[in-house]
Swiss-Prot record:
Its cofactor is Fe(2+); L-ascorbate. The lineage of its organism: Eukaryota, Viridiplantae, Chlorophyta, Mamiellophyceae, Mamiellales. Residues 114-221 form the Fe2OG dioxygenase domain. GO terms for molecular function: iron ion binding; L-ascorbic acid binding; peptidyl-proline dioxygenase activity. Prolyl 3,4-dihydroxylase that catalyzes 3,4-dihydroxylation of 'Pro-61' of small ribosomal subunit uS12 (RPS23), thereby regulating protein translation termination efficiency. The keyword Oxidoreductase applies. This is Prolyl 3,4-dihydroxylase OGFOD1. It comes from Ostreococcus tauri. 2-oxoglutarate binds at residues 146, 212. InterPro entries: Oxoglu/Fe-dep_dioxygenase_dom (IPR005123), Oxoglutarate/Fe-dep_Oase_C (IPR019601), Pro_4_hyd_alph (IPR006620), TPA1/Ofd1_C (IPR043044), TPA1/OFD1_N (IPR039558), uS12_prolyl_hydroxylase (IPR051842).
Length: 514
């Protein structure tokens, strides 16, 4: 195998390679440093910056800039062999029989196919890739070559680490990663793609002046007789059979079938709700909007003397936790329980076993729990929902949630697809020092409702969300109640909350089956 593109030390290793360098925990992977000749790799980076166009892509799973597949360099770049000769050489060496044989030897896998499957991924500040296992089609080995700035060391505080997750006996990833690898210049990571094992993520890049650049791709197995169900199993499809995401139990609510709020109903709600939303004219107007659009947002929903103490309490909680924001377990405790698994979701749910007087006085979760129980789970509120939506509500799932910056999200997948119509009622209590920052969407934390498609084993199974998909998005805003009609076949997600957010997304969510 030609070795003139490699560093001297790596070229020597290539000639005597074995699998002794493989780490086995949490699953087989190998990490190399000083892989390529420094001058050669700098030329690759220069060509990449000069001739390749990176397109912004964002879904529930990731936020990244990505170039075209490097297999298509000759089709995308005029005079490619003249303008990007080093990128072409790199691609040809990576998928040459010699290097594929080296990968097979080091990883202990069987023969690998020569099909080129790689691209350049660019992570600027705020970009991320959430937990998944890469299982699509015939992928066998995943690899990443890092081309971040060669003249500026990458530090842990910059984010962008490749994170590897362990799995339990049910092939479900643990809540937090066990291995973290910095995207250092001229390093390379490889790991075997394995269903229910090779869970990994790219932590959000938090450095404003650094860019995480990598060439990543897959080596595919040569075996053409893989069982059909194994070959077509993607991370998205596996969510049908995985251990379900954790959440609170559903509760039966006994709803009086009234067409509009009665006097006693209104009296019960005047202690909590802005009186504007209790007037008969307003109820009719809200219902008209809801029936026409399928959703409505009601701002300043709670009375000021209810909302303001909540805001102060939640802001203090975010400030109190700010010193530990880099730690995955920050915010745990006081009956706040992490909900997972992380290839489906990660957020904190308030689930008290019992409430002591101390908890009532000091715990922000208990404050929200009381609001949920006294207002949202009351028959008066349920009948108000009936009046403003025109829907009879029979079942409800209610929950107090916290989505922490830099950690938390939910993903859209088959498990969130509704089998029957529902009314999603969410009181968002997100504030922070500058609430307007949430409006752009750059901080994440918004809630989306989208159609959930059928199974697929395509490499782009996590498709970009386009306007043609009739996506409905609700931006986080303090003291805002949103009501959304969720039809059969629709799923939802809460977009990952960026580390740049100054506060968590706090909410109380209720789902009514209609």
């Amino acid at each position: 195998m030609p070795d003139h593109i490699y560093s001297h030390s790596f070229a020597q290793f290539l000639r005597n390679a074995d699998n002794s360098v493989v780490n086995i925990n949490p699953y087989p992977y190998v990490a190399f440093e000083d892989v390529f000749d420094d001058t050669f790799l700098r030329e690759c980076l220069k060509e990449l910056k000069s001739y390749l166009t990176a397109h912004f892509k964002e879904t529930d799973l990731f936020k990244v800039f990505q170039t075209t597949d490097l297999a298509n360099l000759e089709d995308c770049i005029r005079d490619a062999h003249t303008n990007v000769p080093n990128l072409i050489r790199l691609r040809e060496h990576l998928y040459s029989p010699g290097f594929r044989g080296f990968v097979s030897t080091v990883t202990g896998t069987g023969p690998l196919d020569g099909a080129v499957d790689c691209s350049c991924n660019i992570y600027t500040s705020g970009c991320h890739l959430l937990c998944h296992d890469d299982v699509i089609g015939t992928r066998k080995i995943s690899y990443i070559i890092y081309l971040s700035d060669p003249d500026c060391d990458w530090l842990a505080v910059d984010g962008g680490q490749l994170e590897l997750y362990a799995s339990d006996r049910r092939t479900v990833p643990t809540h937090t990663p066990v291995v973290s690898i910095l995207p250092s210049w001229n390093s390379m990571v490889m790991f075997e793609v394995s269903p229910g094992r090779s869970f990994h993520a790219v932590r959000e890049v938090s450095a404003e002046m650094k860019t995480r650049v990598s060439i990543s791709g897959w080596f595919h197995t040569k075996e053409r007789h893989i069982k059909r169900n194994q070959r077509e199993t993607s991370t998205l499809d596996q969510l049908h059979s995985m251990i379900p995401a954790t959440h609170a139990e559903w509760a039966v609510l006994h709803v009086n079938r009234v067409l509009s709020p009665s006097y006693s109903l209104v009296q019960d709600l005047t202690k909590w709700i802005n009186p504007e939303y209790l007037r008969s004219e307003s109820v009719k107007r809200v219902r008209q909007v809801f029936e026409a659009d399928g959703s409505v947002q009601l701002f300043n929903f709670l009375l000021p003397h209810i909302a303001e103490p909540i805001k102060r309490k939640l802001n203090r909680e975010d400030c109190r936790n700010s010193r530990h924001r880099c730690m995955y377990d920050h915010g745990y405790g006081d009956s706040w329980v992490v909900q997972g698994p992380p290839h489906v979701q990660r957020y904190l749910s308030y689930q008290p076993l019992e409430c002591t007087l101390a908890n009532k006085r000091s715990n922000s979760g208990e404050l929200l729990k009381k609001l949920m129980c006294d207002l949202f789970e009351s028959s008066s509120f349920q009948n108000w929902v009936r009046a403003v939506t025109g829907s009879v509500c029979d079942l409800a799932h209610s929950e107090v949630r916290r989505f922490r910056p830099g950690f938390d999200y939910t993903l859209a997948h088959a498990g969130t697809k509704r089998c029957s119509s529902e009314i999603d009622v969410t009181l968002c209590l997100t504030s922070g020092p500058n609430p307007a920052e949430w409006l752009s969407g750059d901080l994440g934390g918004f809630k989306c409702f989208i159609p959930i498609g059928s199974k697929s084993d395509r490499a782009d199974v996590y498709e970009e969300i386009g306007e043609e998909q009739n996506m409905r998005s609700v931006t986080p805003s303090f003291n805002c109640l949103s009501l959304v009609k969720v039809n059969t076949g629709i799923g939802d997600f809460v977009k990952y909350v960026s580390t740049s957010a100054k506060s968590s997304r706090w909410d109380i969510v209720c789902r009514y089956s209609t």
